[in-house]
Each structure stands twice: as structure tokens, then as C-alpha cells.
UniProtKB/Swiss-Prot annotation:
Annotated region (Disordered), positions in chain: 43-84
The organism of origin for this protein: Drosophila melanogaster (Fruit fly)
Keywords, comma-separated and alphabetical: Signal
Protein name: Antennal-specific protein OS-C
Signal peptide: 1-27
Bias-annotated ranges (Acidic residues): 49-67
Name of the gene: Os-C
Tissue-specific expression: Antenna. In the third antennal segment. Expressed in sencilla coeloconica.
Length: 135
């Protein structure tokens, strides 16, 4: 019995190692894309193609050193407003916050709202504090 279990463990371990090696090989990028000096110029270089040009980050121009206009760093529309981003207009902020805070239309939220309303309107009467007299 133990001999058969050892075989299965050995086989499953071997398969797991092979699977790990295959997934690591597939995870590597196939193409290296380098953006050259101009915006429209793109160089696609295969991983196996080595021209002897090693990437030297110290020789590359950084954003601070560049003489490019701020237009490239931050896109601006023609009417001098920032480009469209994930911005919520001011008039929609309050309804979104109220929707998040107030109970929703689901049954549990409705029940909770009714319970809160009931508890707010509850006034203890004299019958709650009545004590039975033993005569």
C-alpha cells in the first residue's frame, strides 16, 4: 500500500514541477516595445534579437531633464481644460453620498428603516411600569 502511494507522490511531484516550469516559460514577454524619441516612433524588438544595444538608464533622458512641453506630460484639450478623467461632477456628489448612507431598496434595509422609525416613535406608557398588587 505504501509503495503505491510513494509512486503516486513521486509522479504528482514531477508533474507539479513540470507545470511550474511551463507556466514560468509562458509568463515571459514575447516582445519588448521601446518608445523612441518621437511620439509616433515605436520600435518593436524581439527578445532573441540582440543588437548589442544595452539599455543604459543613466544615458537616457529623464522627465526632469527633457525640454519637452508640459503638454506631453499632461494632456490638455484645445479649450485649455484637463482631459476627461474619472471625475464626478459636483451636483452628483451629494446624491451618491446619500445613496451610500441611506438604506437601500432591499428588504433588509426597508425593514431596518421601519424598525428605526418604530423605535423613535415608541413612548413608554404607564402600563409598562405597572406593578401588580397582591391583594
Amino acid at each position: 500500500m505504501g509503495f503505491h502511494m510513494g509512486r503516486q507522490l513521486l509522479l504528482s511531484g514531477f508533474l507539479l514541477v513540470m507545470l511550474q516550469m511551463v507556466t514560468q516559460t509562458q509568463a515571459r514577454p514575447q516582445d519588448v516595445i521601446t518608445v523612441a524619441g518621437e511620439e509616433t516612433e515605436v520600435v518593436i524588438k524581439r527578445e532573441g534579437d540582440d543588437d548589442g544595444d544595452d539599455d543604459d538608464s543613466s544615458s537616457e533622458e529623464t522627465v526632469e531633464d527633457s525640454e519637452e512641453s508640459r503638454r506631453r506630460r499632461r494632456e490638455v484639450n484645445t479649450d485649455n481644460t484637463p482631459s476627461a478623467r474619472a471625475v464626478i461632477p459636483g451636483e452628483q456628489v451629494v446624491p451618491i453620498l446619500l445613496e451610500a448612507i441611506l438604506p437601500s431598496v432591499d428588504a433588509a434595509g426597508d425593514r431596518f428603516a421601519r424598525s428605526v422609525q418604530f423605535l423613535k416613535n415608541l413612548t413608554p406608557g404607564s402600563e409598562l411600569f405597572a406593578v401588580e398588587k397582591n391583594e
